[in-house]
């Protein structure tokens, strides 16, 4: 009789799905790497094909999720002007696409020029202006996405949705996703969450979830120790040490491996 596989061991079906996803990601990367067409000709196709890669619904013709969403800017002098969001999903994101020219050397080395970075910063400011111009009834989306088609995707988040500044997500060092990084399942999962549940990426919610899980584990540990005959006072002292140790690890007070 064949021994059962340990829990968590991938099944042949799981492996096949993973292989298919990896193959699809590599095909997407190859398809879009260094694409030279104009912004208008490529931005919508890029979004549609990215949606297919991530397994999410592409934009529709409905105003809550569409390409070229009309926006009206209200100016201080009472005048108005019109704009259009490249791609908009209510409660999820404002998406601004560009087609810049990072240069051949930048493409090879993965570096970018100041002019390229400045252009993306300008695109970010444009996207934030769109987010602030949305009707109050719709609220502001938690994410602003800035894309240089065929090169990078930048994520900026403002989870309070109160009009505060959108900041690099998850941090200034890794908010820029290069096209080749779409081969990473974790990166694809992050992008997928923009469509399915953007607020699930809120660090405060993740921390609260972890805190609740830890509290539940410690409560069960306390019950088991007391059930085993340990007095409440030593149990409480032990759990306090556990909490302090976790805190010390989180803030870097404990030495890491090899130090």
Please describe what each predicted stretch is.
Residues 52-59, 89-90, 135-139:
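Short, solvent-exposed loop/edge-beta patches enriched in aromatic
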Residues 54-60, 248-259:
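Short helix-capping/linker segments at secondary-structure and domain boundaries
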Residues 1-30, 77-83, 92, 97-128, ...:
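Short, basic/polar, glycine-containing "phosphate-handling" surface segments that engage DNA
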Residues 65, 71, 164-165, 170, ...:
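Residue-level signature of transmembrane alpha-helix interfaces in integral membrane proteins
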Residues 60, 71, 173, 181-183, ...:
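Solvent-exposed, flexible loop/coil residues
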Residues 57-91:
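Active-site metal-binding core of divalent-cation-utilizing nuclease and nuclease-like domains
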Residues 29-69:
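Acidic-basic catalytic patches of nuclease active cores, encompassing PD-(D/E)XK
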């Amino acid at each position: 009789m064949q021994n059962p596989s340990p829990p968590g061991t991938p099944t042949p079906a799981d492996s096949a799905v993973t292989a298919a996803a990896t193959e699809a990601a590599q095909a997407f990367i190859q398809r879009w790497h260094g694409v030279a067409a104009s912004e208008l000709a490529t931005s919508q196709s890029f979004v549609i094909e990215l949606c297919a890669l991530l397994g999410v619904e592409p934009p529709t013709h409905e105003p809550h999720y569409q390409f070229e969403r009309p926006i009206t800017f209200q100016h201080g002098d009472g005048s108005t002007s019109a704009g259009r969001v490249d791609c908009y999903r209510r409660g999820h994101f404002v998406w601004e696409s560009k087609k810049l020219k990072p240069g051949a050397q930048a493409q090879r080395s993965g570096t970018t020029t100041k002019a390229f970075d400045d252009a993306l910063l300008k695109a970010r400011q444009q996207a934030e202006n769109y987010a602030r111009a949305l009707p109050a009834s719709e609220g502001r989306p938690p994410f602003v996405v800035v894309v240089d088609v065929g090169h990078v995707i930048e994520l900026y988040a403002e989870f309070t949705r109160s009009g505060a500044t959108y900041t690099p997500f998850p941090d200034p060092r890794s908010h820029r996703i290069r096209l080749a990084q779409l081969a990473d399942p974790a990166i694809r999962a992050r992008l997928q969450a923009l469509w399915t549940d953007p607020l699930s990426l809120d660090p405060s919610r993740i921390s609260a979830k972890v805190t609740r899980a830890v509290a539940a584990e410690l409560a069960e540990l306390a019950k088991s120790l007391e059930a085993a005959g340990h007095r409440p006072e030593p149990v409480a002292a032990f759990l306090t040490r556990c909490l302090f140790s976790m805190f010390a690890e989180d803030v870097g007070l404990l030495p890491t491996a090899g130090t």
